[in-house]
């Protein structure tokens, strides 16, 4: 732009000024500017003779609306600059069109001409000056040419190209080439170019292919390493979670056991309803009662029974049983009145109607407290075994730790603990690191109810040596269920290896963490109880006792618990239990050939307590060795001569506690045979159960090998016939009664049948067995061999010591009790017989060819064994792996009364509410057993 002069008259500008598109292109010649304006253009700011620049609009200049062009400051009178819209939008130019050559010529800025269809030109807008600088020529390829070029390059058919670019065939490496590359990769994962070229020449492949293979191999190796690390972290995380869960459960159990509630049915404060001092568990919002056994229709196991008393415990007679064992367990200040509102599952000599009684003074008809002997109570200062968590063991290691340096097995012996009979050395530790210990248990079988450990929450088994307690923990749908029982109610423990077909099923179903190691094997432990366990339930609302949550109340009716797990964990648990409770260790029996020492630390295995010999049992008037697994005394925890256990002279002599748990002896005239009369027989006399009957009983005395009471009442029937009730409590819990074939565990003698009380009421005639053994010592197997016409419960018992073998005695049982005595019997599971029927017991009678044939009768008793395992994790509380349609489980009926008085027939079932057990011979299953209590049994009742 030219420089402007500043004449005195204001000066005139004749040049074209193009400030913007909104400014006029041509300014009038007479446009005068003030000195201020000119100085403003020149960058100077004078202070005199200021004049305003006229504001002529763009439209006025274009349209020539100025009437006086000589006077630039003149505008029409009607012009109002305030109403002028100074913001004007730029007109949009027409969209340009492109010709084939798409060439742009120089355009004129004064006019915009329409483009030619052949060679369109884009001219400048009218707002541009005519003599402005010409724009540069932009040459571009037309859209059509661009499309054609792209189509030609992509190989479209229009351009004549191929539809797909040719791909080179992928070269596959041979096995030799791959092996060579793997060897080189093991030497160096990223070789230099010289090595890669050498490899390419050796394998006759391009060096580029070698480079790519090494890259892919490094990526694959990194991926494999990352996955392995993730799997390792996952396993460690799961193990930490399991250990944390075990620790929390142990703490919760310890808090509950340490509760000082005075209303405990167990000795040592193991309460059925505790003061809820446990901070890990919620406080209950309602009172719950503990019912071991419910007669009448089965109730829902999900809902705890509400207690009738203000303190919701002692609702079953088993609480009285426990309190009678330990009179000092409850202080005098806590004496309360409780109501026995249900019949007990504990066998008693007679029934007692509902009445109130004191905890400290139980009625004599139930039990009489001991006065001269204080029963064992758990103590917390017996032993101390440091706990150690091992991921490989799946739980707490019992004896995998190093022995404490202060422990000396040969130290001086202290006076024995009169409460437990335990002898400890002066240098033995006196505190526990943890009171509850976890041991591996993959499968739990109680009767027909099974629980498989598919996850850690499905089944967790604990034991507490200081508290003398076993516990099973089961979690289902957010509810925690627990089964507890004390060491003092364990009659016997039998241990043997798991055989086929259960072995394959367990190996195929168990999780990897629960499977035995290559040098291990599966172990089965059968625990026989004398009373049912205690059941607990913990929900978000609270915790407390509940009813039996197992299907069909199997845990209340069947007192045999079968636990399957790894041998190492089982033997370590048994070793610790034996040390904590020598009396319980004296009833542990091992299968011949089992060697627990290979799974225990030799430093601890050398201190194993010794087992009593069978001669000691016979000499002291106890039961002979139990049949089956324990008939060979050399199999009891090793060699008999090496581990022979002798009772210490400082330990209190064992006593038959059943004598103290029976009613007074009265009216014994003319009731029993001239041979030895047991206290239980005398109790039956005093209860008038046998009043007016001419009966010869094969009496039963509880086994005192464990120094704790067994059943209060048990009868051995005629042992001259094809079976006897008290033969053995080894019951082969996982052998199917319907199978006929060799079993993995043989019985004691080919001529001695093995008794199997069974919950399965299989309708098999006795005449089949009689045809197989017509002239054996079993007495011909006549259907009328047994005849009982009284309502007597026959529980699961041990072998009688007085009448050991079949044919050794001619004592028979013929009991003719009056019908009114039926109302006094407190049991719902009774077996009656007529001339054409027999009581319900299953037998396995071995033949000379070692073939076990089963004889099953027409009813059942509630002391049974489990059939062979049908692997399936059940649900809690009302589910079982033994479905009715299972081909491994025979359909059966449980807990009924076979009415066999003259003129009466039918199966009296007290479970009419969807029980999984089927009444296989139930012509009159509609009779309610509950209505029969307190009433005379009428043959016309159908």
Swiss-Prot record:
Q: Which GO terms describe its biological process?
A: cell differentiation; positive regulation of glycolytic fermentation to ethanol; regulation of transcription by RNA polymerase II
Listed Polar residues bias regions: 1-19, 61-73, 99-116, 122-135, 604-614, 630-641
| Residue ranges with Basic and acidic residues bias | 142-151
Q: Which gene encodes it?
A: phx1
Q: Which domain of life is it from?
A: Eukaryota
State the compartments where it is located. Answer: Nucleus
Where is the region Disordered?
Answer: 1-54, 61-80, 87-172, 604-651, 892-922
Presence of keyword Transit peptide: no
> Could you tell me where the Low complexity compositional bias lies?
153-164
Which SMART domains would you find in this protein's record? HOX
Protein's organism? Schizosaccharomyces pombe (strain 972 / ATCC 24843)
Keywords (alphabetical) are: DNA-binding, Homeobox, Nucleus, Transcription, Transcription regulation
Pfam families in the cross-refs: Homeodomain
Provide GO CC annotations from the record: chromatin; nucleus
Instruction: Quote the function comment for this protein.
Output: Trnascription factor that regulates the expression of the homocitrate synthase (HCS) lys4.
DNA-binding region coordinates:
164-224
Please state what the protein is called. Answer: Homeobox transcription factor phx1
Q: Which InterPro entries match?
A: HD, Homeobox_DNA-bind_prot, Homeodomain-like_sf
Main location group = nucleus
Specify the taxonomic lineage. Eukaryota, Fungi, Dikarya, Ascomycota, Taphrinomycotina
Check the record and name the SUPFAM superfamilies matching this protein. Answer: Homeodomain-like
GO MF term list: DNA-binding transcription activator activity, RNA polymerase II-specific; DNA-binding transcription factor activity; RNA polymerase II cis-regulatory region sequence-specific DNA binding
């Amino acid at each position: 732009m030219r420089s402007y002069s500043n004449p005195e008259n204001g000066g005139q500008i004749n040049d074209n000024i193009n400030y913007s598109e909104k400014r006029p292109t041509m300014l009038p010649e007479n446009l005068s500017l003030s000195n201020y304006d000119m100085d403003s253009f020149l960058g100077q700011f004078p202070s005199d003779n200021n004049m305003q620049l006229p504001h002529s609009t763009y439209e006025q200049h274009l349209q020539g609306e100025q009437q006086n062009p000589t006077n630039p400051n003149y505008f029409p009178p009607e012009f109002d600059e305030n109403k002028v819209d100074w913001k004007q939008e730029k007109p949009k130019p027409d969209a340009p069109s492109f010709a084939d050559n798409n060439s742009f010529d120089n355009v004129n800025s004064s006019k915009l001409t329409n483009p030619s269809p052949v060679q369109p030109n884009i001219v400048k807008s009218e707002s541009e000056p005519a003599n402005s600088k010409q724009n540069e020529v932009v040459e571009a390829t037309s859209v059509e040419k661009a499309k054609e070029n792209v189509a030609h390059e992509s190989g479209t058919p229009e351009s004549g190209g191929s539809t797909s670019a040719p791909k080179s065939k992928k070269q596959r490496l041979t096995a030799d080439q791959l092996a060579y590359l793997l060897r080189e990769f093991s030497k160096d994962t990223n070789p230099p170019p010289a090595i890669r070229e050498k490899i390419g020449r050796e394998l006759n492949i391009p060096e580029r292919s070698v480079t790519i293979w090494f890259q892919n191999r490094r990526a694959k190796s990194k991926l494999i390493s990352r996955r392995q690390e993730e799997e390792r972290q996952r396993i460690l995380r799961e193990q930490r979670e399991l250990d944390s869960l075990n620790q929390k459960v142990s703490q919760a159990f310890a808090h509950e056991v340490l509760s000082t509630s005075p209303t405990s049915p167990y000795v040592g404060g193991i309460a059925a309803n505790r003061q809820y001092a446990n901070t890990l568990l919620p406080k209950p919002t309602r009172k719950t009662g503990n019912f071991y056994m419910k007669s009448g229709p089965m109730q829902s196991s999900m809902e705890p029974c509400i207690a009738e008393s203000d303190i919701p415990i002692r609702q079953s007679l088993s609480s009285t049983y426990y309190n009678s064992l330990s009179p000092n367990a409850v202080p005098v200040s806590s004496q309360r009145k409780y109501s026995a509102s249900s019949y007990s599952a504990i066998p008693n000599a007679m029934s007692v109607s509902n009445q109130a009684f004191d905890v400290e003074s139980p009625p004599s008809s139930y039990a009489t407290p001991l006065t001269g002997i204080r029963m064992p109570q758990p103590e917390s200062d017996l032993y101390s075994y440091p706990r150690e968590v091992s991921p490989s063991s799946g739980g707490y290691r019992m004896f995998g730790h190093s022995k404490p340096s202060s422990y000396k097995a040969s130290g001086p012996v202290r006076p024995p603990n009169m409460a437990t009979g335990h002898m400890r050395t002066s240098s033995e530790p006196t505190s526990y690191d943890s009171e509850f210990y976890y041991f591996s248990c993959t499968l739990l079988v109680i009767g027909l109810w099974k629980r498989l450990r598919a996850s850690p929450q499905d089944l967790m088994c604990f034991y507490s040596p200081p508290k003398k307690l076993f516990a099973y923990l089961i979690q289902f749908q957010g509810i925690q269920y627990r089964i507890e029982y004390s060491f003092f109610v364990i009659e016997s423990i039998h241990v043997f290896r798991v055989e086929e077909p259960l072995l394959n099923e367990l190996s195929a179903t168990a999780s990897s963490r629960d499977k035995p190691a290559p040098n291990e094997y599966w172990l089965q432990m059968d625990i026989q109880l004398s009373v049912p366990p205690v059941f607990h339930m913990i929900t978000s609302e609270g915790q407390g006792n509940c009813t039996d949550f197992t299907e069909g109340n199997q845990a209340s009716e069947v007192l045999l618990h079968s636990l399957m797990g790894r041998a190492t964990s089982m033997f370590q648990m048994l070793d610790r239990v034996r040390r904590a409770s020598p009396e319980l260790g004296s009833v542990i029996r091992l299968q011949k050939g089992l060697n627990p020492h290979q799974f225990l630390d030799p430093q601890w295995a050398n201190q194993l307590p010794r087992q009593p010999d069978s001669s000691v049992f016979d000499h002291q008037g106890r039961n002979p060795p139990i049949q089956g697994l324990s008939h060979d005394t050399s199999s009891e925890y090793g060699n008999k001569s090496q581990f022979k256990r002798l009772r210490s002279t400082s330990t209190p002599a064992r006593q038959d506690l059943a004598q103290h748990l029976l009613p007074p002896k009265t009216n014994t005239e003319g009731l029993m045979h001239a041979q030895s009369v047991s206290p239980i027989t005398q109790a039956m006399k005093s209860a008038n159960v046998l009043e007016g009957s001419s009966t010869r009983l094969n009496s039963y005395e509880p086994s005192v090998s464990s120094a704790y009471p067994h059943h209060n009442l048990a009868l051995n029937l005629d042992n001259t016939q094809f079976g006897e009730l008290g033969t053995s409590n080894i019951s082969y819990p996982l052998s199917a009664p319907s199978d006929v074939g060799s079993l993995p565990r043989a019985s004691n003698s080919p001529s001695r049948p093995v008794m199997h009380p069974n919950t399965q009421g299989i309708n098999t005639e006795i005449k089949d067995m009689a045809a197989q053994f017509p002239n054996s010592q079993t007495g011909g197997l006549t259907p009328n061999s047994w005849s009982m016409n009284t309502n007597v419960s026959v529980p699961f018992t041990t072998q009688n010591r007085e009448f050991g073998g079949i044919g050794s005695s001619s004592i028979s049982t013929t009991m003719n009790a009056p019908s009114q005595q039926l109302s006094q019997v407190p049991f719902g599971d009774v077996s009656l017989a007529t001339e054409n029927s027999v009581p319900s017991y299953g037998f396995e009678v071995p033949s000379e060819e070692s073939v076990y044939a089963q004889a099953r009768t027409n009813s059942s008793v509630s002391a049974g064994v489990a059939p062979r395992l049908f692997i399936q994790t059940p649900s809690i509380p009302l589910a079982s792996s033994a479905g009715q349609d299972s081909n491994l489980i025979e359909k059966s009926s449980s807990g009924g009364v076979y009415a066999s008085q003259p003129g009466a027939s039918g199966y009296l079932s007290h479970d009419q509410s969807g029980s999984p057990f089927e009444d296989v011979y139930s012509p009159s299953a509609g009779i309610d057993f509950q209505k029969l209590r307190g009433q005379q049994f009428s043959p016309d009742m159908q």
